[in-house]
Amino acid sequence: MTAEETVNVKEVEIIKLILDFLNSKKLHISMLALEKESGVINGLFSDDMLFLRQLILDGQWDEVLQFIQPLECMEKFDKKRFRYIILKQKFLEALCVNNAMSAEDEPQHLEFTMQEAVQCLHALEEYCPSKDDYSKLCLLLTLPRLTNHAEFKDWNPSTARVHCFEEACVMVAEFIPADRKLSEAGFKASNNRLFQLVMKGLLYECCVEFCQSKATGEEITESEVLLGIDLLCGNGCDDLDLSLLSWLQNLPSSVFSCAFEQKMLNIHVDKLLKPTKAAYADLLTPLISKLSPYPSSPMRRPQSADAYMTRSLNPALDGLTCGLTSHDKRISDLGNKTSPMSHSFANFHYPGVQNLSRSLMLENTECHSIYEESPERDTPVDAQRPIGSEILGQSSVSEKEPANGAQNPGPAKQEKNELRDSTEQFQEYYRQRLRYQQHLEQKEQQRQIYQQMLLEGGVNQEDGPDQQQNLTEQFLNRSIQKLGELNIGMDGLGNEVSALNQQCNGSKGNGSNGSSVTSFTTPPQDSSQRLTHDASNIHTSTPRNPGSTNHIPFLEESPCGSQISSEHSVIKPPLGDSPGSLSRSKGEEDDKSKKQFVCINILEDTQAVRAVAFHPAGGLYAVGSNSKTLRVCAYPDVIDPSAHETPKQPVVRFKRNKHHKGSIYCVAWSPCGQLLATGSNDKYVKVLPFNAETCNATGPDLEFSMHDGTIRDLAFMEGPESGGAILISAGAGDCNIYTTDCQRGQGLHALSGHTGHILALYTWSGWMIASGSQDKTVRFWDLRVPSCVRVVGTTFHGTGSAVASVAVDPSGRLLATGQEDSSCMLYDIRGGRMVQSYHPHSSDVRSVRFSPGAHYLLTGSYDMKIKVTDLQGDLTKQLPIMVVGEHKDKVIQCRWHTQDLSFLSSSADRTVTLWTYNG
């Protein structure tokens, strides 16, 4: 033994010991909170098992049943038992919410929660092991509280969910085994190891003290050896060294052969007494928002509940491996509750600072109000807090004092006092809430009137310029008055209005108005601008032509922020879509759609063209084809649809023959535009350093061979640490998604979970990935974990279909999928539900993309057509669709330009076509 020895201790293992102890003592709220903060889980699970655990701990019961569907066809899997476990937990939680609502005297919500509980009970009937079990569950409906039943005396959602997972885990472990990649995560702490180590540590201190007393001649009797134990402070032997072990090693062997009397150690543990109030708060708070009957429902736990329990049991699937983050979920819940599904998801995404949309709120948990649309300052904001700030403060005091004060009355008296005190508060709240809802309805009517003015007020050519200017000024004055009512900052708006009036005056003398902030130009006689007013922006314009009322205009892309130029310039709406109207009748679709977009460039190849991608700057686009050829073409400097009666060949700036050994299936530019990645059925990913100015390669290719099948899609995102580009790639073969640090040339992660070939990828938010697969699912992945954080199936109606393309709108709230059954699905990411599934095409939808402002959805299909869907209306109802392009063979990919109203389409007819808006 050397003079110095080293013992390696991992903090992760210490946390696992603590987690095991908390689990053994049923302190599951604390256990899950520790998992959330540390990112450590006490267990050895596969990625799929971790995801199943996350779904159960989140209370996503429908998703759990959907996730487990592939196992239900196996004979060995006890489908009936598994469904019984899940549905029983769902029933108990619905019952728990019902009890909490009853205690708070909320009759409006009580009916809904009772209905939810009854529905769960009916679903349980066919899966119950016996009639007696079903009768016992029915009996629970008659109890005032679930905890009044002896079996559920100590029941709480956190513990119940953990136990539910443990039971489910035993059933599915055989089918979802831990995989070899997780073996380094360490072993699971068990058998109350922390308690054992504490006791052994105490005994070690006693031994050290006893040996020291023998060495110094101090007399300590055998009965006194254990009397000096102090678990919290120790006995003074705090030095961590090997002196005792070294001393024992120097003792002669004969010492250890001496006979001794074996003694037993009796350990008496004073059990922890949990506060009864904490347990009740756990029942009250985490489940109510989960069962909200509609998005605008004001059911939210009171802020004062944070004094008793700060952890939400319904967190977002956006965070740590264990899925316990509550911050983003709280934001998501708020967003869902303030916007009915009839509002366009695009309306949420306004990049400007000022935002007048009543459905958009401050997404900050520290802000407890939205932009109030009423000059009445005492009106409570129901979307953010169910009671006014004064009432909220009173509620906080009334609940915190009994929990913490020394002069607490009995529990029954406390509850009666709280209920009596809260009755008046809730009555006042409902009165104020009714006033506020009426006020919102009035404001919504005004907003619709303003929008009607926008659509009708500036399109009649027969009105003289003076009348048009008067209309503009009248609308501006009304809008300014409206802004004042809404208490929104008006800094600098006066200058903008002056500039608008000057521009209106200037437009009298000449008809030359710019129509683009980039190179998009039109002749003076055809130029136009539209009067537009969205939530936080005002523009003015002159009409286009007498027939423009039947024309489908694309207006500004970003409805926020002033786009006013200098005094010598005209108002230039940013190229892209806007809150303009794309609505039209079905009969007009085929007749007028060809006029909306015209073909200006066609690139021909010898074989089918699969992949296209615009450079981030918009001046170039890459094309990859089955002929193994990679091209980079120039985007036209000037876009003039009238000058392109006959489509021209684009200028090819860069070309490389046989770039791959096989067909090029996908191409992608890095965010900085300096890397061009391609994927092929030769199973290689190539990354080409590229200079956009010289249009040439700037270094040797990077080649990655981690895939064992065709690479079907690629995507880039910025690296959070190195700042370099992170390449995301996926395809056939092992069905994994691979992430690669291109700056270092190193692989980062292999994300497994899909059971079919991955056909599509999409990235957003700097760390989120969406993937579509032939296994008929879309998976969301969080690279901060990294693991799958949500699975979205396509079996909402029917048997589902392979997902060929995925896209997420710029706000990160709406997912669009293109599927092989000719359907498109719109999915509310934050709400966790499907908004609509519709069939815009008659064959496979191979490409879907949101316009940069998310007002329109571009789709390409094997039916040879390219269509645009208007997303500005009620997303739950039939959406306006128009044909904007057509090929002679299957359409494979479509991509919007980064700035202009243009898009690329690639096809099996061996062409790539550039289409632009025929403005």
From Swiss-Prot:
LisH domain residues: 10-42
Quaternary context: Interacts with MAP1S (via WD repeats).
Modified residues (Phosphoserine): 289, 292, 297, 312, 422
Matching Pfam families: LisH_TPL, WD40
Database matches in InterPro entries: CTLH_C, LisH, TPL_SMU1_LisH-like, WD40/YVTN_repeat-like_dom_sf, WD40_repeat_CS, WD40_repeat_dom_sf, WD40_rpt, WDR47
Modified residues (Phosphothreonine): 285, 542
WD repeats: from-to residues: 604-643, 659-698, 706-748, 753-791, 798-837, 840-879, 886-918
Primary residence: cytoplasm
Gene3D superfamilies in the cross-refs: YVTN repeat-like/Quinoprotein amine dehydrogenase
Ranges annotated as biased composition (Polar residues): 517-551
Chain ranges of the CTLH domain: 45-102
Cell compartment(s), UniProt: Cytoplasm, Cytoskeleton
Any Gene Ontology biological process: cerebral cortex radial glia-guided migration
Keyword Repeat on entry: yes
Tree of life domain: Eukaryota
Region (Disordered) residue spans: 393-421, 500-590
Native source species: Homo sapiens
GO cellular component, one term: microtubule
Protein name (Swiss-Prot/TrEMBL): WD repeat-containing protein 47
Keywords: Cytoplasm, Cytoskeleton, Developmental protein, Microtubule, Phosphoprotein, Repeat, WD repeat
